[in-house]
Design a protein with these regions (language model features):
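Helix N-cap motif at beta-to-alpha junctions
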Residues: 120-123
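Helical scaffold of the NTase/Pol beta-like nucleotidyltransferase catalytic core
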Residues: 34-94
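Tryptophan-centered motif/residue detector
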Residues: 54-55, 92, 110, 170-173, ...
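Boundary detector for helix-to-coil junctions that initiate low-complexity/charged tails
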Residues: 1-46, 53
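Short N-terminal signal/transit or membrane-insertion segments
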Residues: 25-49, 97-102, 112, 190-211
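Active-site nucleotide-donor binding segment shared across nucleotidyl transfer reactions
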Residues: 81-114, 118
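Conserved catalytic core of two-metal-ion nucleotidyltransferases
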Residues: 62-85, 127-295, 300-332
Length: 332
């Protein structure tokens, strides 16, 4: 019996040592976790304290590379809009650009693009201008292949320092630069007038079916053909003004944003102008009403994505993929 007990102790000794060390390590990890939790709560309190006492509209503009990019973007936007001025196409700031104009008198400090929207009839007119005006280089994107950022990069390089128009399934880009890295970009989006007799239920049923088709992988040509055929066949939309406006087929908002109700014609038209980084840009008639509907009253408060410029992040994903240096837009 003594020999058996001795053998068991001898065999179990290493296991006891492991268990003892594990217990000590677990205690250390628990202590560290408590410290990290306390630090997180402390930082959360500090952030919430600043948010409570600091008006986001008074936030300083971006600095460094991001600020340089923003100012180049607004100069480019004004340049393109001046080229389009003779065509008298009513258009207006959309999305984050409109929010930035109202809340910051320019860019949201961490934003990096400018979105412009217009009615379907005006969007069709804009496409005709892009195809026929010698100030622009229209690209046939129906045969697009490959990763979208690589595709943009190739087309910009092939048309260096020209206003390259690239129609995608979610917007129309106008790029200018020598490559994607140094290019400026302005984006245009179509909105549609909804016929007066169409009910909200009918529109939402159409919207769900359209989104279901769009989110399944398709070639760009298949999507363009779907937009054209569906717009004509559904019978929901009007080229003439009506009292209600919705994101159009070919508008990023249709698939990526939730439904927030209809926009009212009088909230959008007649369009006006607003100061954006010291430049006059086109604006909806009642910008705050538009923003209240799109974002609720929370557009005046702090969002969840603070600090991250999405366009530059997208570019960096491409540069990482091809082994090029990333754009360091961080300010500190």
């Amino acid at each position: 019996m003594k020999k058996l007990k001795s053998a068991l102790v001898k065999c179990m000794g290493p296991l006891y040592n492991v268990l003892f060390k594990t217990r000590i390590e677990n205690r250390r990890l628990i202590k560290e976790m408590k410290q990290l939790t306390a630090e997180k709560e402390y930082l959360n309190y500090q952030v919430n304290y600043l948010k409570h006492h600091f008006d986001i509209g008074q936030m300083k503009p971006a600095t460094g590379v991001l600020r340089e990019y923003q100012l180049a973007e607004v100069e480019f936007a004004r340049y393109i809009l001046d080229l389009l001025k003779p065509y008298e196409i009513p258009m207006y700031l959309e999305g984050g650009a409109l929010l930035g104009a109202k809340r910051h008198k320019g860019f949201i400090p961490w934003d990096d693009d400018i979105d412009i929207a217009m009615s379907r009839a005006d969007f069709n007119k804009l496409l005709h201008v892009f195809k026929t005006d010698s100030n622009f280089v229209w690209i046939d994107t129906t045969q697009k292949s490959g990763y979208y950022a690589e595709y943009y990069d190739k087309l910009i390089r092939a048309n260096a320092n020209k206003n390259v128009v690239i129609m995608t399934p979610t917007c129309v880009h106008v790029f200018n630069g020598t490559c994607l890295r140094d290019s400026k970009n302005l984006e245009f989006f179509p909105n549609d007038f909804l016929k007066e007799e169409v009910t909200e239920e009918q529109y939402l049923a159409f919207r769900d079916k359209a989104i279901a088709f769009i989110r399944v992988p398709h070639t760009w040509k298949e999507l363009f053909d779907f937009y054209e055929a569906t717009w004509k066949e559904c019978g929901l939309f009007s080229l003439e003004p009506t009292s209600r406006i919705v994101p159009g087929l070919g508008n990023w908002d249709l698939t990526e944003y939730g439904y927030h109700g209809f926009r009212h014609h009088d909230d959008v038209y007649p369009t006006t102008t607003i100061l954006f980084e010291g430049k006059k840009l086109p604006c909806p008639n009642k910008a705050e009403a538009i923003l209240d509907r799109e974002y609720s009253k929370s557009w005046r408060d702090y969002p969840k994505d603070i600090g991250f410029p999405l366009t530059l992040d997208d570019k960096n994903k491409y540069f990482e993929m091809i082994g090029e240096p990333l754009i360091n837009y961080k300010e500190f």
